[in-house]
Amino acid sequence: MSRRRAHDTEDEGYDHRRNKRRRVSENQEIEDRLESLILRVGERSTSSVESNLEGLVSVLEADLGTFRLKILRILSDCAVRMPEKCTVYTTLVGLLNAKNYKFGGEFVDHMVKTFKESLKLCRWDAARYSLRFLADLVNCHVISATSLLQLLDTMIDVSNEDTVPQVRRDWFVFAVLSTLPWVGRDLYEKKESALESLLLRIEVYLNKRSKKHHNALRVWSSDAPHPQEEYLDCLWAQIRKLRQDNWAEKHIPRPYLVFDSILCEALQHNLPAIVPPPHHDNFEYPMPWVVYRMFDYTDCPDGPNLPGAHSIERFLIEEHLHHIIETYHHERKDCAAQLLSFPFKHKIPLEYCIVEVIFAELFHMPTPRYLDICYGSILIELCKLQPATLPQVLAQATEILFMRIDSMNTSCFDRFVNWFSYHLSNFKFTWSWDEWDSCLLLDGEHPRPKFIQEVLQKCLRLSYHQRITEMMPTTYAKLIPLTPVPNYKYANEEAANLPGTTVAHQLVVAIRQKCTPEEVVNILKDIPSSGYSGEEMSDGSFNALKIDVFVQTLLNLGSKSFSHSFAAISKFHSVFRALAETEEAQICILHNIYELWSSHQQMMVVLIDKLLKLQIVDCSAVATWIFSKEMTGEFTKMYLWEILHLTIKKMNKHVIKLNSELSEAKDKLAKADSSSSDSEDDSSHKRKKPITHADKPSEEVVERMEEKLEAANVNQKRLFLIVFQRFIMILSEHLLRSDTDGRDPDTDWYRWTIGRLQQVFLMHHEQVQKYSSTLETLLFTSDLDTHILEVFQQFVALRA
């Protein structure tokens, strides 16, 4: 009997555990169903948004008792992550508040907490979407207009803070302005004087703020035909136009209007006092930008009109399209489909809006959010999905860009080249080149022929030389790239007169017979250090002829492909290192790569990248070589700046990696010390597994890491000093010579060069910013020509 009773008890225990698991499983299913219903509310279905909301409110109201916290979390997440459905979710919250006042208060508290947390963690978009949601809850009678105005006033108070960056003040003003389209009408009707007072404070701030950064962020230097407006100025003009229209806009869907009779009966909540967190030096704020304009209503002849540049609808449409790209940019097909499914597509010329927004992203200064190819691939998918209209709009946009290229920012010029060449490669390189042949009459340094030349160079990377030659009209012959073959001087007719020819031929035989690096060194040691016509140090610290013979011979033998060249460099890595002991020797290596491969830009780029990775040449040597007299003829070509930027990026990544490793080591050391002190005080073993002795870095290791980081920072600073000093020297020389000769200094060469200086500042702004005070003290001093100094001052103003 006793065994039977024990058996029964075990069965009861098993049943209890099984029932508990079933309940947990059932609860999880209900939670998943609730989440799915909330996420999909308002999306296209057989029923209207209003009936969707009514049904969902009934479901949620029944489940509030059990799943209150889950529902709160899902709704607050939707507010931040799905801002395009803001008014749908505020209506949902409003209806729930009308039925359950306590839940409404809990949601407001939860949303306020989300807002404050976003500000504290510098999640600026999340904070702005949270603020917008809170504001729209005023329309749904959940939050009182008075308490919202108090919050908006508190945020505008930040604009009066002293000794904080302007970008901080700008963001708080932008957050308030971008919220007003949702709630402006309600505030106008209920609290007009308070709203006007708020707008007056904003206007005072906007009138006194500095816009030194504006010119650095422009896509074009000219304002014709479309003004290049700074983002806050543009939004302020749009808000003023909205105010003139009595805050009536035509874009935002407002499902709560249908439920006004229910919502107006609900009790409202007051927002608590919210104080923005004070500024800290480690806070990073969004940088300013210039609003991109490519089209106006005259460019869209058929169908609905494009909203004016200062209509609030233009801002709302563009923001929505930007958010779609942000959400779906990882998957180009989904992104294109979502863009074409824009909910208000019948009210606007959608294809024009999409193309303008994508180019706005591509040309965004200082850098685009995503890789250039991301935007190119999305445009290709759009052309596939909408073949009847989108290719024509894109061709129209390309024509506009080409006609305005004379005043285009240099960084945007590069991106335009990269996009157009990529786009052509996906459409059989078909283009109506004859329409652009007027550019052939212009000087070779003019942006139009330069654009076509650079596009063909990029197309060559994506195709082959014969294909490029066949696709172009014969009139473009002078712009077609040279055949990309090595120029190996030791095989030329004049080779017999060159001092290294005999050894070069010996080296060819030895390498083909798979000789070792040591055997190569033995062959090279017979080369005399004198009698070489190339540049060489007077003290003979390196043998230029040795480098010449070795580099040109080895790379010529590996010229069949990138892989062959890489294999050759890797095999004879030790020989390269032995020959490249000084910076001058490294520059000599670069000189020989250029001499061999001057007709193959891509080969030069990848070879120099490989030499940097293998630490055969230093970053500073590459920078010095780029600004050498030898490269004067190449100075305005894109590939040279591609090399400089990959060099700087290589250095930046090295510094960031060392910084990260040091921080990680310090954290481990601190945690290990903390664990050991805890173990002395606490005999309990119920704590997290401590860091083992093997994981703990020693203080000596941390010190060595600090020394490595310090050395890397010194090298990084030196690299930037070399680059900026060389820019200053050549630009100052040009300006002085022009002044002396009485010539206009504003030549094509000057515009390219000053544009490249600006590009270095903007592309690497995060790293250069660390050394801005050093640069100001040593290089960009007050006695420098204002044209050069302005570029530096505009850069500093970006974070001021």
Curated annotation (Swiss-Prot):
GO terms for cellular component: nuclear cap binding complex; nucleus; postsynaptic cytosol; presynaptic cytosol. The modification Phosphothreonine is found at residue 9. Residues 31-243 form the MIF4G domain. It is found in: Nucleus. GO terms for molecular function: mRNA binding; RNA cap binding. The keyword Cell membrane does not apply. InterPro entries: ARM-type_fold, CBP80, MIF4G-like_typ-1, MIF4G-like_typ-2, MIF4G-like_typ-3. GO terms for biological process: 7-methylguanosine mRNA capping; mRNA export from nucleus; negative regulation of viral genome replication; nuclear-transcribed mRNA catabolic process, nonsense-mediated decay; primary miRNA processing; regulatory ncRNA-mediated post-transcriptional gene silencing; RNA splicing; siRNA processing. SMART domains: MIF4G (SM00543). Transmembrane segments: none annotated. It holds the Pfam family MIF4G. Keywords: mRNA capping, mRNA processing, mRNA splicing, Nucleus, Phosphoprotein, RNA-mediated gene silencing. It comes from the Eukaryota. Residues 1-26, 669-700 are annotated as: Disordered. Its main location: nucleus. Belongs to the NCBP1 family. Component of the cap-binding complex (CBC), which binds cotranscriptionally to the 5'-cap of pre-mRNAs and is involved in various processes such as pre-mRNA splicing and RNA-mediated gene silencing (RNAi). The CBC complex is involved in miRNA-mediated RNA interference via its interaction with Ars2 and is required for primary microRNAs (miRNAs) processing. Also involved in innate immunity via the short interfering RNAs (siRNAs) processing machinery by restricting the viral RNA production. PANTHER family: CAP BINDING PROTEIN (PTHR12412), NUCLEAR CAP-BINDING PROTEIN SUBUNIT 1 (PTHR12412:SF2). Component of the nuclear cap-binding complex (CBC), a heterodimer composed of Cbp80 and Cbp20 that interacts with m7GpppG-capped RNA. This is Nuclear cap-binding protein subunit 1. It comes from Drosophila yakuba. The gene is Cbp80.
